[in-house]
Amino acid sequence: STSNVIDDLQLYGLVVLRVLIGWHFLYEGIAKLLNPYWSSAAFLLDAKWIFSGLAKWIVSNPSILSLVDNLNMWGLTLIGACLILGLFGRHVSMLGMLLVLVYYLFTPSFWWLEYARPGEGSYLVVNKNLIEACALFVVYLFPTSELIGLDRLVFKNNS
């Protein structure tokens, strides 16, 4: 419950965090949906570490790759919209956290791994996906959508 939020300023800060992450997800999803040439294949082919075999298997199966692409595009879009609107807050923050952790596990920022895509800087272990997953965990722990969001209206009879 959000009773753990100490004051209004903290509540608004957490709502802003939720909305900003939602915007990032929504933008990434829509950008992929609008690009007829987008595919997760390049990302998957660059996978290193424990899931590289799974990534190559996904790319080698067109129907599985299409499913993964659609799950990515629509998942990002719907999770982002729900985070912005404060709808199904705890569920979508957990789904979003799991999604970016999958991205992290396929391409972790370990210093001994080299990727074809140029990096955004020199990460040791922590990258933007890990940070966003942790931020979504905070959003999960403090479900602000129960106070500021559609969850307040949709689930008002359950509280």
Where are these regions (language model features)?
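Extended, low-polarity transmembrane helix blocks
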Residues: 1-45, 49-78, 85-159
